[in-house]
Amino acid sequence: MSSFEVTEAGIGDLRGALESGRVTAVQLVEAYLRRIEAYDRSGPTLNSIVVFNDDALAEAADSDRRRSRAELLGPLDGIPYTAKDSYLAKGLTAAAGSYAFANLVAQKDAFAIERLRRGGAILIGLTNMPAMANGGMQRGLYGRAESPYNEKFLTAAFGSGSSNGSGTATAASFAAFGLGEETWSSGRAPATNNALCAYTPSRGVISVRGNWPLVPTMDVVVPHTRTMADMAEVLDVIVADDADTRGDLWRSQPWITIPAASKVRPGSYREIIPTDTAAARKVLAGKRFGVPRMYINADPEAGVGEGLGIGGATGQRIETRQSVIDLFQVAGAALIAAGADVVLVDFPVVSNYECDRAGAPSIKTRGLVSPEFLHREILDLSAWSWDDFLRANGDPAIPNLAVVDGERIATGHLASLARIAALGIPTSRENQHADDWDALLAAVTAWQARR
């Protein structure tokens, strides 16, 4: 057993230990598995990793053999990571947190998994999420992940934070990094609640082929790391051109030209990350940072609108705790000390989406898109994309959406509500997305009727 400590170890630390012989890839995987057993499956039972890669130790042994022969596949060879339950990882189930897909087996890898496997990184397992990523901290097939910092707080935003398992696993050092996925803010919310770095890419920068979709116009891969240096390591591997566009709506649609990833990425992300505090200060000097008033209790007009957003009432006033505002002020002072400007700003993109104040429109009333389009984008397109995902995967047991009991996509959520109620936990908030489920089920049923 190696004495190397993986807690809070960065990718560079892990690679250095591997290169020096202080630890082997097998010992790294074993160390992470011990942490998972101690804190995820027992003790505080954080419940972040829900599907394990039984080949992880064998893959680590392969990495060690490559290292002994100086035949490494890349800078992440031997580095363990996790991925959300919405990623296809060949041979593992890919339930996306839904009872209906509990036994769906991935016949191939998602693009990001494929890239990491090709580079020698080792998948520890898949992380928790609500059913089909529809929500945030609602419990799905595997329940939900809990906060590694404070049992009284959520590890992601309740309404939109479906990559909660990835956030917990990465923050708790159950792997070097995690792969989340995002439609609204499902990648950023767990990062915010767990002091992590998250990268939400522009369309087409990271291929989403092989990821379960929710709303294909918005779905993106979102890596989670503990530092920006680690983020650069991951992006150097997964930001790459993908010739196969199936399952990636923006790259497959013919109307808007999306540049190839190789045309928009730097030669090396690692080379653009400052290596010390002095270099970081130079990067920040002269930059202008905006702090939205609505998030620090400084916008009296926020939250007074009477409009409705896509799924119901939105645009409520955000009441931020003083302890959080204090942290805003500390961060602002640090930026100013580095030579940056920090200014209070309005956030019209939010106001115009949520109708959060008198006179502001919502996405439904602004006139840029019709209510019919919103229905088709969020419901009909979701049903179509689920069917296409299943067909592209090719599991003979679940070859398409037509053979799926549509109600189990949603009623699994109801089953979890029954379990929660039996524990004496209030279920009112758990059922927050019930109307969404009803609408999605209707779209699935309509799709099945046309097949």
Give the predicted meaning of each segment:
Residues 13-20, 101-104, 219-226:
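Short, well-ordered beta-strand elements within core beta-sheets of diverse protein domains
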Residues 96, 141-143, 352-380:
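Charged, often glycine-rich, active-site loop that binds/positions anionic groups
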Residues 42, 76-221, 249-255, 292-294, ...:
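Short glycine/serine-rich loop/turn segments
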Residues 1-68, 91, 330, 337-340, ...:
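An N-terminal boundary/leader segment
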Residues 197-323:
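A short helix-breaking turn/cap at a secondary-structure junction
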Residues 13-16, 263-274, 297-301, 309-316, ...:
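Serine-dependent amide/ester hydrolase catalytic core
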Residues 26, 63-80, 230, 277-292:
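Immediate post-signal peptide segment of exported/extracytoplasmic ligand-binding proteins
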Residues 22, 29-30, 273-280, 318-346, ...:
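Acyltransferase
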